[in-house]
Amino acid sequence: MLLAGGGGVVRLGALGYFPAVLVEEARLGPPPGRSSSPPPRGVLLGLHPHGLICSPLWLHVLPGGAFRARHGLEFRMATIRFNFWIPVWTDVLVALGFIVASRSSIEDNLRAGNAVGLVVGGAEEAAAMAVDRFDLVLRKRKGFIKCALRAGAPVAPVVTLGENKIIRQVLLPPGHRLGAITRALFPFCQRHLGFVPIVPYGRPFFGGLVPASVVPFQSRLVTVMGKPLPMPEISEPTQEELDHHHERYLAEVSRIYNTYKSRCGLVDSPRLRFVA
């Protein structure tokens, strides 16, 4: 109870700090007041981009039961196994509804009728984030679509415009010795720990006397939760079936980004690219 209350405070405080907007194109769960038997399958939410703090989680989804109140579904957030190795932090994650980002865990929760969030681009996408680009590590990532097909659960893209501007990272120039060392560590850290070494920074303080901090920049954030894409239940999807439904998903992410970039006055946002 204490954690839920604390989460609500964090959410309200963040909403007061950021010019944040949430657009939900459809209700994800059954209509209010209507129960179904058997219970409906859950929904897999693909969150984009990863960014460095994944703001839509803390602003709109996790705290205070807001997601369940709006959509009638329990929410579970999938995260790397490494996060569950840290004492005390593990208890916080469990209390907030986090689960391990494994195929069995995701599929079990979808079959149980829960909404499951997954930041598909992972550590590689976080390392690629910059103010002047919006690159999603999504072109070859199809495992989440396979989970949805095996569970027969729809998939809804959640795209946040402005996420690449609120926390930035120190980017060392090509040829810099320290940059070469950190880039060499990327594959090892990503493969064995699930994250990559990044040096983040936020807004300056005291008129620039403190040139950087951990406080995010006050950039406008527009989070769009798209309409769920229905998925057939296929216990063992073929590569052709997987590719087909993955392309549907990419098209929907592109539609959301390009539509709301102009509709919400964010025309200066960089071009969306699917990489890796």
What are these regions (language model features)?
Residues 1-9, 37-112, 122-140, 180:
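Catalytic core of membrane glycerolipid acyltransferases/transacylases, capturing the structured
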Residues 11-38:
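A short, well-structured juxtamembrane/interface segment
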Residues 13, 91, 146:
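Surface-exposed charge patches
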Residues 15-17, 70-72, 150:
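Short, well-ordered coil/turn elements that cap or connect secondary structure elements
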Residues 20-22, 77, 272:
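Generic structural signal for residues in well-ordered beta-strands
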Residues 22-32, 62-64, 102-106, 132-133, ...:
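Eukaryotic intrinsically disordered and solvent-exposed regulatory patches
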Residues 108-276:
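Non-catalytic C-terminal accessory region of glycerolipid acyltransferases
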